[in-house]
Amino acid sequence: MEIKQLVLNKAKEAKESSRFIAKASTDLKNKIIVRMADYLKQNKDELIKANRIDVENAQKKGISKALIDRLTLTEKRIDEMIKGLQEVVALPDPVGEITKMWLRPNGMQVGKMRVPIGVIGVIYEARPNVTVDVTGLCLKAGNSVVLRGGSEAINSNIALVKILKEALKDEGMHEGVVTYIDISQREAVLEMIKLEGIIDLIIPRGGEGLIRTVTENSRIPVLKHYKGVCHVFVDRDADLAMAEEICFNAKVQRPATCNAMETMLVDENIAKKFLPNMLKKFEDAGVELKGCLKTKKIYPKVKDVKEEDFYQEYLDLVLNVKVVKNIDEAIEHITKYGSAHSDSIVTKDYNKAMKFLKEVDSSAVFVNASTRLNDGYQFGLGAEIGISTDKIHARGPMGLEELTCTKFIVFGNGQIRQ
């Protein structure tokens, strides 16, 4: 069977199953997710065995250590997936929630109710944990899901989906609620994103290349972030000890994440006082430093920064450093080079803090806090499917609520249009 038909069949299976999960009770959805967690626990050895095949294949192909690390499943990582499902069970179910209700002059009551989106297509790369994470979230929000993982993780994902489907079946739910496109060719992605009317929303999770391909070719609405080019601006009125701690955390704690700082901006009035200790601390942590001319005068060890570097999402221990005249120049820099993801100011000046919050147009803007905190759990929203830099439907961490939409509901007692 050709790829086009195979992808269509999988998507139709998800579409047909979506009405059953959409009307499922919270209790049933939670039971399914609990069973998924139990089955993962019972099948750890099988999962690690399947994953080992993917890891060995990746090593033979010379794939980078960073990618192999993301690909690898360990007992600890499976436990984290199980914990993630358990946390989804504990979250309130948004489906059926009436968010507004108002009375019209004719006595008619009009309201808005949260309902599932329907069928969500998730396209991702070499991270098998995404298979479980997004399934739990989509299912709890009453959606069926069409998964297409990276070819590097195909054996791991097939093993995971088999377990997830068994849990659905054993709780009496249609197995088509979770479908996996086990076709490694890129054509499968291009066919999947054409299926308007069957798949309702596409969420790509991966590198900039994948997200750009999906966005430029999809006939279905796409919820995404291209990349995280995040900034911390250290204002002249900053608490410098606090600034040092925030900047170090934003870069070093987990540099491969989308909310890690890529450029540090420093007000020229405090640059000579702040930069020597800060940059030495980064250097000791193994951070490669690239700086502007003013930075080099203060700390000659830094490499020259090029303009194209300011657009880069390094996802590594590499940092751009720029000395700016004031808050206005900092905001101009962020506006030009940033990706509208996560940006922070460190300052004791309330007016500057409010100016930064108002003028920096990102999914999350921070005052005196690390960009690494742009996260569903950190915000108290629970598990997330990703962080959106879009402005339509969802922006910032996308949790259960963002995997629903609303419909109008109307209560009348005989009203007609005059």
Curated annotation (Swiss-Prot):
InterPro entries: Ald_DH/histidinol_DH, Ald_DH_C, Ald_DH_N, Aldehyde_DH_dom, G-glutamylP_reductase_CS, Glu-5-SA_DH, GPR_dom
Pathway of action: Amino-acid biosynthesis; L-proline biosynthesis; L-glutamate 5-semialdehyde from L-glutamate: step 2/2
Catalytic activity: L-glutamate 5-semialdehyde + phosphate + NADP(+) = L-glutamyl 5-phosphate + NADPH + H(+)
One GO MF term attached to the UniProt entry: glutamate-5-semialdehyde dehydrogenase activity
Listed Gene3D superfamilies: Aldehyde Dehydrogenase, Chain A, domain 1 (3.40.605.10), Aldehyde Dehydrogenase, Chain A, domain 2 (3.40.309.10)
Leader peptide range in chain numbering: none
Compartments in which it is found: Cytoplasm
Example of a GO cellular component annotation carried by this entry: cytoplasm
Keywords of the record: Amino-acid biosynthesis, Cytoplasm, NADP, Oxidoreductase, Proline biosynthesis
GO biological process: one example: L-proline biosynthetic process
SUPFAM superfamilies: ALDH-like
Keyword flag Endoplasmic reticulum: no
EC number: 1.2.1.41
Recorded family membership: Belongs to the gamma-glutamyl phosphate reductase family.
PANTHER family according to UniProt: DELTA-1-PYRROLINE-5-CARBOXYLATE SYNTHASE, GLUTAMATE SEMIALDEHYDE DEHYDROGENASE
The protein's name: Gamma-glutamyl phosphate reductase
Organism of origin: Thermodesulfovibrio yellowstonii (strain ATCC 51303 / DSM 11347 / YP87)
Top-level taxonomy: Bacteria, Pseudomonadati, Nitrospirota, Thermodesulfovibrionia, Thermodesulfovibrionales
Gene label: proA
